[in-house]
């Protein structure tokens, strides 16, 4: 995975933030009565789903000695999300036009042909067909 950029925290000029007195610090290891009885639980970190790990794996297959910045990874992730959304929307419209409630590989293939230009669409369709064939043969 790509290394994360170091986050800078805003400086408070050596002073405690407004509304918090220095005496309010909690000791580590001691639980409050509410936490011990199970009334309130801390929320865990919300997970952000990205294509970063997959983009990184493809990069290493193509150019093993090349890295990628966090900003570039973010841009590529946005790009993949955008294309995915366009293809899904178009496939949904095609299914609705044909009065079908299920999006099949045929709708995906047609939407890719409509969205992507020329040679790019041909390559995408051939790679998609290859992936579906590989999946179908391994599932049996």
UniProtKB/Swiss-Prot annotation:
Chain intervals for the UniProt region annotation (Disordered): 1-48
Keywords of this entry: Acetylation, Chromosome, DNA-binding, Isopeptide bond, Nucleosome core, Nucleus, Ubl conjugation
Superkingdom classification of source: Eukaryota
Cross-link (Glycyl lysine isopeptide (Lys-Gly) (interchain with G-Cter in ubiquitin)): 134
CDD domains in UniProt: HFD_H2B
UniProt PTM comment: Monoubiquitinated by the ubc2-bre1 complex to form H2BK123ub1. H2BK123ub1 gives a specific tag for epigenetic transcriptional activation and is also prerequisite for H3K4me and H3K79me formation. H2BK123ub1 also modulates the formation of double-strand breaks during meiosis and is a prerequisite for DNA-damage checkpoint activation.
Subcellular location: Nucleus; Chromosome
Cross-link Glycyl lysine isopeptide (Lys-Gly) (interchain with G-Cter in SUMO), where in sequence: 8-9, 25-26
A GO MF term: DNA binding
Assigned GO CC terms: nucleosome; nucleus
Record field: compositional bias (Low complexity): 11-21
InterPro entries: Histone-fold (IPR009072), Histone_H2A/H2B/H3 (IPR007125), Histone_H2B (IPR000558), HISTONE_H2B_site (IPR055333)
Chief subcellular location: nucleus
Ranges of compositional bias, category Basic and acidic residues: 1-10
Pfam families associated with the record: Histone (PF00125)
Modified residues (N6-acetyllysine): 8-9, 15, 25
Family statement drawn from the similarity comment of this UniProt entry: Belongs to the histone H2B family.
Complexes and interactors: The nucleosome is a histone octamer containing two molecules each of H2A, H2B, H3 and H4 assembled in one H3-H4 heterotetramer and two H2A-H2B heterodimers. The octamer wraps approximately 147 bp of DNA.
PANTHER family per record: HISTONE H2B
Biological function: Core component of nucleosome. Nucleosomes wrap and compact DNA into chromatin, limiting DNA accessibility to the cellular machineries which require DNA as a template. Histones thereby play a central role in transcription regulation, DNA repair, DNA replication and chromosomal stability. DNA accessibility is regulated via a complex set of post-translational modifications of histones, also called histone code, and nucleosome remodeling.
Name this polypeptide is given: Histone H2B
Organism placement in taxonomy: Eukaryota, Fungi, Dikarya, Ascomycota, Pezizomycotina
Gene: htbA
């Amino acid at each position: 995975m790509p290394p994360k950029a170091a986050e800078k925290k805003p400086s408070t000029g050596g002073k405690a933030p407004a509304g918090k007195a220095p005496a309010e610090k909690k000791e580590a290891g001691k639980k409050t009565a509410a936490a011990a009885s199970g009334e309130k639980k801390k929320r865990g970190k919300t997970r952000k789903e990205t294509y970063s790990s997959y983009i990184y794996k493809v990069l290493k297959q193509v150019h093993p000695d090349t890295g990628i910045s966090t900003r570039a990874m973010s841009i590529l992730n946005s790009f993949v999300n955008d294309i995915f959304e366009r293809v899904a929307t178009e496939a949904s419209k095609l299914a609705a036009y044909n009065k079908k409630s299920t999006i099949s590989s045929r709708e995906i293939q047609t939407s890719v042909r409509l969205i992507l230009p020329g040679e790019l669409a041909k390559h995408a369709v051939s790679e998609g067909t290859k992936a579906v064939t590989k999946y179908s043969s391994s599932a049996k």
